[in-house]
Amino acid sequence: MKKTLFATLFLGVMAISANAQLSSNPYKFLGNITTSYNVDAGGGVPQFYKLWNQITCENESKWASVEGNRGNFNWGGADNAFNYAKRHGFTHKFHALVWGSQYPNWLSSLPAGERFTAMTNWFDHAKAHYETLPMIDVVNEAVSNIQGNPHQPGNPMIKETLGGGGKTGYDWLIKAFEMAYERWPDAILIYNDFNSLRWDVDNYITLVQTLRDAGAPIDAYGNQSHDLGDDRYGKISEAELKSVLKKQQDALQMPMFVTELDINIANDAQQKAQYQIVLPLLWEAPYCAGVTLWGYVHGATWVDNSGLYKNGVERPAMTWIKEYMQTDAAKNAVGPLPGTKKEASIYIRPAALKVASGDVLPIKVRAKMATKTIDNIKLYVGSELIATMTEAPYITEYTASSTGQKTLKAVVTTTDGSTYERLSRIQVLSGTTKREPYNETVPELPSTINADEFDQGLSGISYYNVSRQNFTTTALKNGAWMEYTVDVKEDGLYSMEVEVASMTDGGMFHLSEYGFDNLTFHTNITQVPNTGSATTFQTLRCPMTEPLTAGRHTFCLNIDKGGFYIKSMTFKALPEVELPGTLEAEDFTNGDGVNIISGNGGLVLGNTTSGEWVEYAVNITEPGKFGTYSYEATVSSAVEGSSFKMTLIESDGTEKSLGTVTVPNTGSLNTYQVKTGKIFTPIKKGKQTLRINIVNGGCNIDKLKLICATGIISAETEQTATEAQWFSPDGRRLSAPQKGLNLERTVINGQTVTRKVIR
């Protein structure tokens, strides 16, 4: 936030919209929402742009409205509103990316890992459609009330989808903001909720403070403000509203938006009187960046009596709002985000929110300016200046010398002399056990780490809700987590194989890392099967979602749902598979639902079921024309009809089917055969992704070999197709290919192709 936030000077700041009839204030807008999926309400009500200079879609940009049918995205309603705003020169807000209410109906039927994939896909499609956005309600209504009940019944499911509470209790929200910032770094990212000004004030403040303190890229807090005046619940007083606004701002020190203001009062005089109390207090607050009213047409709002126009005629409250917006107080009120633009992105990222007394805590100030240049950043702990930083990445260390809560403050000074501030907090615990690797030895990856060898330190710093002493005899608990300091020897793709045991289904875990610039999920959320007993361990393969960089990392093993046991984690480097060549089926880089089991003298994909899939990073070293490639799949099955589909995904996203492999009944899952076949698809050279989708389950897959012929030596046109035939180099007919050089003759689309094949 700019230090000179409350100054009245705004040289060069343009009015948001030349067409705005109510607000001419350059620091903040007075906006509204769509009416029954339309922008202009009709019915004698003035056109939208003649009243308001900001628009929010009431429903049109919510996930359920856009992707009601999975994979089909309907942006028509949102486009209509946003394009209207652009035509008339005012701003708009995307509402909302994450909400535990209006999500697609199909989402809840998916397992957690697939739900996260679906949510990531939702973010990606929103980014692809809207390259830039001025403002986003990233998360809507995630607070729990004073009774502990979530504001929306879908919140527990959404929380699980985004990785659970984790180290902070709000990691799922941090993850949502990181995902939004990754895609729209210049947007103003907002947390939005109701009852934040009356009944759930403290829980709301705690949530927003935690996001801010953890370094999440949250830029503002949004008060919906439905709780300020209602025939059902009464009216807030002027004194109470003043008090709670001050309480919020003192605690948060961030810009505030009033996001969904309405006064649901049937009596005209009482509605007007309540607007006269609340609107000036909200609008004139120097930390208020804008006010959005939640509907204005009687009969077309979510509650009965909040409309400001009834039968096309202004209610007295609307007449007063128009008069108030022309006063000097309304016109000259200052705000934190001139022109509704984010100049400074400043987030303080401590390595942890808790630290032992006497220990050293690394801290990064994530700082980026939109149009200005950073000269220096000063970081304070309380009133003590601990660092002045002039070059990115703006990382320093703090040695915790006394216990208690500490306030961090970053002051960013730009080359034009402007200053911007951001706060955070850390807790210094009274314990003096410093955080360090288990047995003071940092394991090098690739290697195996026993699950009980998590870092030494205090509870809440290096682990939570687990006991090293009872680790092998006590099932892991919901919300537990353990951190492991490791040293990755080389950049590259890795996988994690986890030995688990469980007497029930439903356990879940994932591996994450609290980096300075992101909360990274290194694995997808993995479900733990019922292995039969607490001592019967099964290996689960968890591909790492992104390549690891060489150097020191701190991995966090998050127990999303407990009730199971973990013995060890084995980290393996995955070599990039060169094709032609052999691909070991267990060496996948991504996948969903598959199991790795022992088989055929090693590891295999086992007990496959329909819908499972795996992907492999491959490098095609030899391009192939139509029919040049063939495959050999080492497989087993005890049933008829098992099959899997092979697809090659090129670097530009183009998908090419390589065909479907029908797995024969080999008599037993322990009896493996080699299934051969032709690939009638041209294959390009270069790095690509090979995907295997299980069409009909019941098979095991050990390996897949792709073979490219060394060259086509003759071709002649034929009128009828024949089966592939094998010949020796001297022309002798063979019943099957032999070791060494073979000639293969195959009729493809009426053309006989003879190829050299080396076995």
Language-model segments: which ranges?
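C-terminal outer-membrane/trafficking sorting elements
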Residues: 373-385, 409, 709-759
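Aromatic-rich peripheral "rim/lid" segments of glycoside hydrolase catalytic domains that contact
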Residues: 67, 137, 142-166, 179, ...
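Boundary/entry segment of secreted carbohydrate-active catalytic domains
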Residues: 21-54, 58
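Substrate-binding cleft and catalytic face of glycoside hydrolase catalytic domains
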Residues: 50-68, 76-196, 265-267
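Glycoside hydrolase catalytic-domain groove-lining segments
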Residues: 76, 81-86, 166-189, 199-269, ...
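Extracytoplasmic
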Residues: 341-390, 397, 403-405, 409-709
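Short, acidic/polar
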Residues: 36-50, 118-126, 200-211, 275-279
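Acidic-and-aromatic substrate-binding clefts and catalytic sites of carbohydrate-active enzymes
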Residues: 32-45, 63-76, 103, 143-146, ...
